[in-house]
Amino acid sequence: MPTYNQLVRFGRKSKTRKTKSPALESNPFKSGVCLVVKTVTPKKPNSALRKIATVRLSNKRTVNAYIPGEKHSVKEHDRVLVRGGQVPDLPGVKYHIVLGAYDIAGVKGRKQGRSRYGAPSKQVAVTKK
């Protein structure tokens, strides 16, 4: 408990919140260039080969970004769009690649949750007579 004199001299400082995706610099998305595409294994107790890419963002920062969905078309030197979002069982992966943006195709054959995976709608276009 501070004394009255300490409050007069220093005041109360509000705590600053630490962002979970600092490389985005308060932006919802950042574009970047893919440097390396690789697979990594998750923490215990999970087991898989998760696909990640090392991306150099437009602000010159390098981050590891997760590639969601089954199969992907991410290659080295592709232009990608990166959003925030951690992968719970991959330490150090705090970003996701947005599928269906720039050089990256969406997941083919996706019926549900299509917007997350950049999959197009299966609705037939109405033709005018």
From Swiss-Prot:
CDD domains, sorted: Ribosomal_S12
GO biological process, one term: translation
Residues carrying 3-methylthioaspartic acid: D89
Compositional bias per record (Basic residues), positions renumbered to this chain: 10-20
Annotated PROSITE patterns: RIBOSOMAL_S12
Leader sequence segment: none
HAMAP family named among the record's database cross-references: Ribosomal_uS12_B
Protein name: Small ribosomal subunit protein uS12
Source organism of the structure: Rickettsia canadensis (strain McKiel)
Species classification: Bacteria, Pseudomonadati, Pseudomonadota, Alphaproteobacteria, Rickettsiales
